[in-house]
């Protein structure tokens, strides 16, 4: 038999036809299975779906996914069901009462995970704190991390953290002097986070410039790749497309680059206060050890740096708030010294600015989706094992019934002495509804360290510089983009002016 010769265009037409037919058949069978299970599962009502794409046609329009879902919640309520392209439905939670039911009241019931294929590459197939199901392995990992970032251990790092920050301030000033006072603070904030976390991971005295720069560059690449791979999350069959297969190859290559940077530092006699000491003392494979180190960098560096820059962006646009924050910091330091880590707990307005930033720009606005670990219930509805639940933190944090004027940046809403009469909303309700790091047993394990890192970076940068628009009247673009985390679509550029400091003269 003669070999079959298919021209390039014909091949792709046939391939696309096969994919579409396969997807239709798969979709129909999944819908049949879904509705058969509906006899024992009560799904919250949601928008109608279309074949193959599910509800994707209602999630576009040029708005971020968390905003589109929040808009649907205005129609379908605080809990509704959607299909995002694939063949598995998902419950979307959009108010604090329903969120507490899933995250707190039935925390163990909804403690499982479903890891996207692209992330399995860098998480040892979901064997890390954020992505593995709860159980002995997860509890042991979390316990080990907590032992390394407990308050006393973190405080013992403060002297080095303060020294690193002063070096960073000097670097920012030098950079600005070469560019007419204009700076992009994101990379500088990432560098500060990288240095502290490298000491948590490898030991307090650790210092290695090649690793800091190499891992930072690799993390940027991973964020880029994961954004390109989102198609395969919605349509599982899309992972066979050439573009998606390239994303997979690129992610493996980037992961291996990081592993090669980490491997030389796994040596005998590691410092007992390092996270790597804990990891190597367990019966973990090298892949799990590497993936855990990568997770701490991945979740800690970008999230803290992005949050600090979001806060700076608000302060550039709200000069009165920036000056009020500066006066508080200056009153604490007397204008005679840099900010110290111990100052942070004595700066209530700084904490309010932090809370308001995390409210308006939660770093993971859709959190990490939860999965029912067993058959359970939700507000009296039967939910079968394996059901996905997504908590829309953005919608919860922008609920006008909880946060009056939710789209206005108002740190005062979190100050008891200013908001004692409730004019900015009920402060107790707002505090309990602010869950940027999640809640319950799956709350972010490094939440306290993350808040300290952001607060210290923000306080130091405001103490040292006045932050202004690049040109008069041109406010920062607060448009959002999302990959692992929520970051600025157009990174902040600002003009900085060194504040007069006697200790620098």
Curated annotation (Swiss-Prot):
Heme binds at residue 444. Induction: Up-regulated by elicitor treatment. Keywords: Endoplasmic reticulum, Heme, Iron, Membrane, Metal-binding, Monooxygenase, Oxidoreductase, Transmembrane, Transmembrane helix. InterPro entries: Cyt_P450, Cyt_P450_E_grp-I, Cyt_P450_sf. The keyword Protein biosynthesis does not apply. This is Salutaridine synthase. Its cofactor is heme. Optimum temperature is 30 degrees Celsius. Its main location: endoplasmic reticulum. Optimum pH is 8.5. It is an enzyme of class 1 (oxidoreductase). GO terms for biological process: morphine biosynthetic process. Belongs to the cytochrome P450 family. Its EC number is 1.14.19.67. It catalyses: (R)-reticuline + reduced [NADPH--hemoprotein reductase] + O2 = salutaridine + oxidized [NADPH--hemoprotein reductase] + 2 H2O + H(+). It is found in: Endoplasmic reticulum membrane. The keyword DNA-binding does not apply. GO terms for molecular function: heme binding; iron ion binding; monooxygenase activity; salutaridine synthase activity. Disruption phenotype: Accumulation of upstream metabolites, such as reticuline, but reduced production of morphine. It is a single-pass membrane protein. Cytochrome P450 monooxygenase involved in biosynthesis of morphinan-type benzylisoquinoline and opiate alkaloids natural products. Catalyzes the formation of the morphinan alkaloid salutaridine by intramolecular phenol oxidation of (R)-reticuline without the incorporation of oxygen into the product. Can also use (R)-norreticuline as substrate. It comes from Papaver somniferum. The chain crosses the membrane at residues 10-30. GO terms for cellular component: endoplasmic reticulum membrane.
């Amino acid at each position: 038999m003669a070999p079959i010769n298919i021209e390039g265009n014909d091949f792709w037409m046939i391939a696309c036809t096969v994919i579409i037919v396969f997807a239709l058949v798969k979709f129909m069978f999944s819908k049949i299975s879904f509705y058969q299970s509906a006899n024992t599962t009560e799904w919250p009502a949601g928008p109608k779906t279309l074949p193959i794409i599910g509800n994707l046609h209602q999630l576009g329009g040029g708005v971020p996914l968390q905003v589109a879902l929040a808009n649907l919640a205005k129609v379908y309520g605080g809990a509704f069901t959607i299909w995002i392209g694939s063949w598995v439905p998902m419950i979307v939670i959009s108010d604090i009462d329903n969120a507490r039911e899933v995250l707190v009241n039935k925390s163990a019931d909804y403690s499982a995970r479903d890891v996207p294929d692209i992330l399995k590459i860098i998480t040892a197939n979901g064997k890390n704190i954020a992505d593995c199901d709860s159980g002995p392995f997860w509890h042991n990992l979390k316990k080990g991390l907590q032992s390394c970032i407990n308050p006393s251990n973190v405080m013992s790092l403060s002297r080095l953290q303060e020294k690193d920050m002063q070096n960073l301030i000097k670097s920012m000033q030098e950079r600005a002097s070469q560019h007419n006072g204009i700076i992009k603070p994101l990379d500088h904030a990432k560098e500060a986070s990288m240095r502290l976390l490298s000491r948590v991971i490898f030991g307090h005295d650790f210092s290695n410039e090649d690793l800091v720069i190499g891992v930072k560059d690799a993390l940027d690449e991973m964020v880029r790749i994961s954004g390109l791979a989102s198609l395969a999350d919605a349509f599982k069959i899309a992972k066979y497309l050439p573009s998606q297969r390239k994303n997979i190859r690129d992610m493996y290559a980037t992961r291996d680059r990081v592993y090669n940077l980490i491997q030389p530092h796994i040596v005998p006699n590691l410092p007992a206060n390092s996270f790597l000491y804990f990891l190597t003392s367990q019966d973990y494979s090298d892949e799990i050890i590497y993936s855990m180190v990568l997770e701490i960098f991945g979740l800690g560096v970008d999230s803290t740096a992005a949050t600090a820059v979001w806060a700076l962006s608000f302060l550039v646009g709200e000069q009165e708030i920036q000056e009020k924050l500066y006066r508080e910091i200056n009153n604490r330091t007397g204008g005679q010294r840099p900010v110290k880590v111990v100052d942070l707990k004595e700066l209530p307005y700084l904490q309010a600015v932090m809370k308001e930033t995390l409210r308006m720009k939660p770093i993971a606005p859709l959190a990490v989706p939860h999965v029912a670990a067993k058959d359970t219930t939700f507000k009296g509805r039967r939910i079968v094992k394996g059901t996905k639940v997504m908590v829309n933190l953005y919608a919860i944090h922008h609920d006008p019934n909880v946060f009056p004027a939710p789209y206005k940046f108002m740190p005062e809403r979190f100050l008891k002495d200013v908001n004692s009469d409730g004019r900015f909303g009920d402060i107790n309700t707002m505090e309990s509804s602010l869950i940027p790091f999640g809640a319950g047993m799956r709350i972010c394990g490094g939440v306290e360290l993350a808040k300290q890192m952001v607060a210290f970076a923000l306080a130091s940068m405001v103490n040292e510089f006045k932050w202004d628009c690049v040109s008069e009247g041109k406010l920062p673009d607060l448009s959002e983009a999302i990959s692992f985390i929520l970051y600025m679509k157009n990174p902040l550029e600002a003009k900085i002016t060194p504040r007069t400091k006697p200790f620098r003269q």
